[in-house]
């Protein structure tokens, strides 16, 4: 999914206090618009498919909200790293959705989790417009994502704007 131009988004495969290497991934900020409002940026963390299938698909995951960080999903539910509630340690997640598809977790709308900028949205339509701008920006930064089948998934209130 990465290319020469996406190197600055690469996440190290070694993370402090995690005793194993995580799969290659990319994370960072993308603006909600290609033309203006660069101050409002959504945070994302993206992992490529690791299995034999799913390389032509891209699933974007949203945790509840609006206003719930999707990092909860990547670190406690569908991601390749899962934090154990008993041992309080990170461990590989054998049931990660990355076994089946390319995955992106997004903190949205702006102002949620690690995303930047003041929340301005007054409606679900405005949240969708902001996400669309983010997605166009992401496709521009990661051209290998263009042409992949896009799937939107989530839980709780996120299902209203999916």
Spans of model-derived segments:
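N-terminal cap/lid subdomain of alpha/beta-hydrolase-fold enzymes
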Residues: 41-129, 136, 140
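Aromatic-acidic/polar surface patches that form glycan- and anion
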Residues: 19, 36-37, 124-127, 155
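Conserved small/polar residues in nucleotide/adenosyl-binding loops
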Residues: 160-162
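Alpha/beta-hydrolase fold nucleophile elbow
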Residues: 145-156
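Catalytic-loop region of hydrolases
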Residues: 1-58
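Hydrophobic alpha-helical cores of multi-pass transmembrane domains in eukaryotic membrane proteins
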Residues: 105, 156-158
